């Protein structure tokens, strides 16, 4: 199976799980709380190489993953809907799509609130003040509330790459240097 087909398959699985979680959260009236718990889980994944390995490695059995996730949700106080959901995902050996599930849930929650989502790539993590300022600037441009998904990619060297729908604004230092390099080649 080509790589593109595999990523679509993973995306489909993530969207189905996220949709199920969203419907349960909507019924319970806890979309915000579930979103906050998922944000905490994503932060834990981003901050721990061992947890990332547990999620993506097929070496761990479903039972090992279940026990680890159960301990994690208990230790960090992630209970109720998200805690049970994570256990089901682990039991079904679908932890490898957890980051995709979290992204898809955020999109569903944003759509439910009438927000649009901007994917932002930055060379460094944004401070809460920078994120708030970026949201305000994007709201001024789009006229809608904007939810921001920030990805850190040191290879862009500096600046931001912002994607909103089909539009992309690339102010990264890497792109500026590439443009300058091309301009110098044309001159020389």
From Swiss-Prot:
It is a peripheral membrane protein. InterPro entries: ATP_synth_OSCP/delta_N_sf, ATPase_OSCP/d_CS, ATPase_OSCP/dsu. Gene3D superfamilies: N-terminal domain of the delta subunit of the F1F0-ATP synthase. It is found in: Cell inner membrane. SUPFAM superfamilies: N-terminal domain of the delta subunit of the F1F0-ATP synthase (SSF47928). GO terms for molecular function: proton-transporting ATP synthase activity, rotational mechanism. One of its GO terms (cellular component) is proton-transporting ATP synthase complex. F-type ATPases have 2 components, F(1) - the catalytic core - and F(0) - the membrane proton channel. F(1) has five subunits: alpha(3), beta(3), gamma(1), delta(1), epsilon(1). F(0) has three main subunits: a(1), b(2) and c(10-14). The alpha and beta chains form an alternating ring which encloses part of the gamma chain. F(1) is attached to F(0) by a central stalk formed by the gamma and epsilon chains, while a peripheral stalk is formed by the delta and b chains. Belongs to the ATPase delta chain family. PANTHER family: ATP SYNTHASE DELTA CHAIN (PTHR11910). This is ATP synthase subunit delta. The lineage of its organism: Bacteria, Pseudomonadati, Pseudomonadota, Alphaproteobacteria, Hyphomicrobiales.
């Amino acid at each position: 199976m080509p790589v593109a087909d595999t990523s679509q398959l993973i995306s489909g699985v993530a969207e189905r799980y996220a949709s199920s979680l969203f419907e349960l959260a909507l019924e319970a009236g806890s979309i915000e709380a579930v979103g906050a718990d998922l944000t905490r889980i994503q932060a834990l994944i981003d901050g721990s190489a061992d947890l990332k390995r547990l999620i993506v490695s097929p070496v761990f059995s479903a039972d090992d993953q279940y026990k680890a996730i159960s301990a994690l949700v208990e230790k960090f106080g992630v209970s109720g809907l998200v805690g049970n959901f994570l256990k089901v995902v682990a039991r079904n050996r679908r932890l490898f799509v957890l980051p995709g599930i979290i992204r898809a849930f955020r999109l569903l929650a944003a759509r439910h609130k009438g927000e649009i989502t901007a994917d932002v790539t930055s060379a460094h993590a944004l401070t809460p003040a920078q994120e708030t300022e970026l949201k305000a600037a994007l709201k001024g441009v789009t006229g809608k509330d904007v939810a921001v998904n920030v990805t850190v990619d040191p290879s862009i060297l500096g600046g931001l790459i912002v994607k909103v729908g089909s539009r992309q604004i690339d102010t990264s230092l890497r792109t500026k240097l590439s443009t300058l390099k091309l301009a110098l080649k044309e001159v020389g």
